[in-house]
Amino acid sequence: MFIFDCEVFAYDWLFVFKDVETGEYTIIHNDNEAVKQFMARSPILGGFNNKHYDNHILKAVLCDADPKQVKEINDFIILKGHNGWENEFLSQYRVYFESFDLMDDCLVGLSLKAIEAHLGIPIEESEVDFDIDRPLTEEELSSTIFYCKYDVDATELLLRLRKIYLQNKMNLGRECGLSASKALYMTNAKLTAAYLKAEQRPHGDEREYQYPKQLLRQYIPDEVFHFFDRLQDLSIPDEEVFSESLDIMVGECPCTIAYGGIHGAIPCYSEETSKDRTIRNKDVASYYPHLMTLMGYCSRNIPSPEVYAETIERRVAAKKAHDGETADALKLVLNTTYGAMLNQYNDLYDPLMGRSVCISGQLFLLELAEHLILECPTLKVIQLNTDGIMVSLDYTDEPKYQEITEEWQVRTGFELEEDFIRKIVQKDVNNYVEVPMKGDPKIKGGLLVRGVLTNTKFELSKFGLRDWPQLKGGAFKINNNANIVAKAIVDRLAYGTPVEQTINDCNEIFEFQMIAKAGGKYSHSFHLVNGEQVPVQKVNRVYAAPFSVEHGCPYGTLYKTHAMKGSTSKISGLPEHCIVDNNNQLTIEAVDKTWYIRLARKYVNDFLGRKGLKRNTRRVNSLKKKCLTLL
């Protein structure tokens, strides 16, 4: 297995291949025959975004394209935004090699440079201009090789971090008779379809949804049925009906019903368990998989519903037998099937069944919530989401609460898993801190969740990394942006610790890093230093810089320039004064902790619903002008 990357210029192209086992590099520059000889070894190639880019450049070289043609294909993909297989030169040839893309099943928009930055390693970008209209000098070529090797090393690091994910794919491939390389090449959705032996069939009944007979309709407001009945009105275009939503109140909880599920939470709400009152959360175990099997919503493209039901049973058996490999591989199937049923390019595509899972799922939970509100006078719905409900109630209502939830389980066949909550603090449905009676707080939301998704517990120091928090989940994601602020918010909301204490007690500089990314639509970035525009990379690690009225600060913020429009704008989310440190040379003494304290306080107030005093911007600006006139 080799990790590879390529670079393309007007008169030069370069490939770097790294043997994962030996660590040996193979570097090839402008030599088509050398590439052919290397590929004759039938290597399995791994890269990042190689399906979209590097594979097509490699194919061009294997088809004897000269540097000019390779550059044209590069521009066809990068500048013009086309797919490589649409290129006229490439479409003439049939070239096959085994590869996989570590960008598959990643969070959309995540770049390799951003991953490097969030991992805390130096962010290295090539200083050689890709628009050079002449052959590279020896110095430029040497520099390009260095940076290309650096990206290959970073991709190899990502390979090791995603070891569990890749192993699950290979195990699942083995289950359905696929080679390891074939399984790695496929996305989770494609691999799931292959495992379930799905064969795409035409379906023209996406809007013929039927309400499940197990539903107690009397507890659900009529307006909800009116909303979903619009499916039957074919005069309403698909794009209109499926983009609609309905806002309702479930007790005191504002909820939104839509074709992506139900979501609701009392905004800026907090509550603690007391001697008279309890907070409970009930999630439906494997809700969407069981909707498919119990309600008959499996894709009609698989041989029979029993195939999917057997997968659930096999996973349960594997977990009981402590067969982690099989259990994790089958979990991939269960977590991926629903989304694949709504993907028109997947063999599981069956939109009626996909819509039915989502609609019935929210109706059953809405029915439960409304029933509880009706018969438990002290009960309050705190949260209602796609697979669970959180409530608080007096202990006097608990017998009725348990009676209703038990009846719901028996009637529907679903299983509710209950958690006892000590404290809940939520900003909205997507941002909350939930403190259980036992264990660490459960957190959700972009303001709070930090770390790298590994789905296991690695010793990250073995990879030369600091001990970042490790997450579990689906698509690969990483976010180590201003971690200290997230920690300060959680400590304050969960335990009452002042944000000043959490932040001032921390002297680990990486906890304060912020990753400034310009984005693909921008040609370059610059840093304002002493009023001058200093060019910087498109992805940068920055820290808040100290500022005083007496001494000021030489450092401004970072800006980005739009590639097409030429317009300049600030990179959002950064301090007015910040320092760039892509090579990790700064110490904590250079960081302005007060900026992070102010930010943490603001977010805590957002959670608690405390609105800060609004500044009269017009009056402030007017006073500024008057002062300047006097000077």
Residue ranges and their predicted role:
Residues F4-C6, I28-H29, G47-N50, K282, ...:
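Short His-Asn-centered micro-motif
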Residues F15, H52-D64, A285-S299:
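Short active-site loop/helix that positions an aromatic residue
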Residues M1-V8, S99-D101, R280-K282:
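Two-metal-ion RNase H-like nuclease active-site motif
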Residues H118-S126, I132-S286, H290, L368-Q409, ...:
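Conserved "right-hand" nucleotidyltransferase catalytic core of DNA-directed polymerases
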Residues E21-A114, Y147:
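Conserved DEDDh/DEDDy metal-dependent 3′-5′ exonuclease domain
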Residues C106-S111, E127-T137, G251-E375, S392:
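Helical catalytic core of nucleic-acid polymerases
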Residues E398-L631:
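C-terminal, non-catalytic extensions of nucleic-acid polymerases
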Residues M1-V16, G23:
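Entry/capping segment at the start of metal-dependent catalytic domains
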